[in-house]
Amino acid sequence: MIVIGRSIVHPYITNEYEPFAAEKQQILSIMAGNQEVYSFRTADELSFDLNLRVNIIISALELFQSGFQFRTFQQSFCNPQYWKRTSLGGFELLPNIPPSIAIQDIFKNGKLYGTECATAMIIIFYKALLSLYEEETFNRLFANLLLYTWDYDQDLRLITKTGGDLVPGDLVYFKNPQVNPATIEWQGENTIYLGNFFFYGHGVGVKTKEEIIYSLNERRVPYAFISAFLTDTITRIDSRIMSQYASSSTPQTSISFIPIRDDAIVATVGHTTTIY
């Protein structure tokens, strides 16, 4: 269910020729049909969220095709022209290097980088935002970047919740409770949901849910009896906050609305929104 202000609406793309119009309409239809409430203050916020999701998917596929390597933190490596590898295996931005240039280099020269899946997801988020921000704004927000698991910049505002409905562009986690300790890096897999039942995970590639579970199950202890599974934890970029930095030159998606109800009372507790 999508709410703009106090109005429950069914949105639709008005320009079928704009880039990724079909994919955007699919995302809108999924959100409108879900039981979960997606609340936005304005239509521009919804437009930003929609374009952000599309760019997350694009960035995930670009990273997959870049040659970016899967490595544990002990074996991680990065391009020393832009990053310094820390003692824990993270990537620290070198002084006087614009974050925008360094993030783009990961996608241009993926073979010069290797790390594990959580860091890859954060890299995808940064790249998606870079597609919607002016470089000056991006560099100001994310100066002194450190890429290391979930240690992301304080200005990157994320929402993690349990029990939401899956939407393309969401980050979701597969858990492998009986992983073989010899390959502990396969205790789970962070993935971006691409839509149409496919996920991208750094290390497993683009696969269906069943294929990722099969891959993780192959890395369990001998005689394991508990299967890997897709958890109900979802992580998203907070569009309400991050939309305020969007470039004015970024084309807005043209969205019109079929009103369903205009007197909704919207209550939000934590990251869960309820309609009365």
From Swiss-Prot:
Please tell me which top-level EC class this enzyme sits in. transferase
Matches recorded under InterPro entries: Gln_gamma-glutamylTfrase_bac
Q: Which UniProt keywords apply?
A: Acyltransferase, Sporulation, Transferase
Ranges annotated as spanning the membrane: none
MF-aspect GO terms: protein-glutamine gamma-glutamyltransferase activity
Q: What reaction gets catalysed by this protein?
A: L-glutaminyl-[protein] + L-lysyl-[protein] = [protein]-L-lysyl-N(6)-5-L-glutamyl-[protein] + NH4(+)
GO BP field: sporulation resulting in formation of a cellular spore
Q: What is its EC number?
A: 2.3.2.13
Record-stated family:
Belongs to the bacillus TGase family.
User: In UniProt terms, what function does this protein have?
Assistant: Probably plays a role in the assembly of the spore coat proteins by catalyzing epsilon-(gamma-glutamyl)lysine cross-links.
Provide the protein name.
Protein-glutamine gamma-glutamyltransferase
Species classification: Bacteria, Bacillati, Bacillota, Bacilli, Bacillales
